[in-house]
């Protein structure tokens, strides 16, 4: 089973598409999850994975195995080696689901990382270099904004935006979308002028200026 990832990637290199290898890829991921967690993906999870792969919305009730669906479809798209981002609503779910996914797919040679708000740029770069990266929607948004502010390409933390799965899509894309992501900071400017003005002011005596008490002007 551990060699299936190489076999499937060779099929992609030979010209086959993800749709061509979908049955074998989902079967491989399903068996990997079963061997590690003793959880067997049923038809509803397989259908959910196919729906998500095709870029559609999949509405699943609590207990229908969304976490498992994400692992299945993530494995399929990770075979392209262009990055898969799993977007969810809080950092607890990010770490919990990333652990489940890593335990399931690491034996297949798939790397899994997670992105947290307290990570520095080097840590984020390492996590986004994984085949699959779990992140919150807000942190992914801020990382994208910061990447568009860097002066060197190698300073970016997100190498490519290829494929993403959005958990709780109604909350992320509708409710939380009302709150804009804003990055603010001190404007870049030449501070030498302020030093010169400060030096000049220090040379003034009381006879050199008058203060208007009404307007508080000079």
Region locations from a protein language model:
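Conserved P-loop NTPase motor core
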Residues: 1-218
């Amino acid at each position: 089973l551990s060699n299936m990832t190489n076999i499937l990637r060779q099929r992609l290199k030979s010209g086959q598409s993800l749709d061509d290898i979908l049955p074998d890829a989902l079967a491989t991921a399903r068996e990997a999850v079963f061997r590690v967690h003793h959880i067997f993906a049923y038809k509803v999870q397989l259908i959910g994975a196919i729906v998500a792969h095709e870029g559609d919305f999949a509405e699943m009730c609590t207990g229908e195995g969304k976490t498992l669906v994400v692992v299945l479809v993530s494995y399929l798209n990770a075979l392209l080696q262009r990055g898969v981002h799993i977007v969810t609503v809080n950092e607890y779910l990010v770490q919990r689901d990333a652990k489940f996914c890593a335990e399931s797919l690491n034996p297949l040679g798939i790397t899994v990382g997670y992105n947290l708000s307290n990570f520095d740029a080097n840590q984020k770069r390492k996590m986004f270099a994984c085949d699959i990266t779990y992140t919150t929607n807000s942190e992914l948004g801020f990382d994208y904004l910061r990447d568009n502010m860097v002066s060197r390409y190698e300073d970016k933390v997100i190498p490519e935006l290829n494929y993403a799965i959005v958990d709780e899509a109604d909350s992320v894309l509708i409710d939380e979308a009302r709150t804009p992501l804003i990055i603010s900071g001190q404007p870049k400017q030449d501070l030498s002028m302020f030093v010169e003005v400060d030096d000049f002011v220090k040379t003034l005596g009381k006879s050199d200026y008058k203060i208007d008490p009404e307007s508080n002007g000079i």
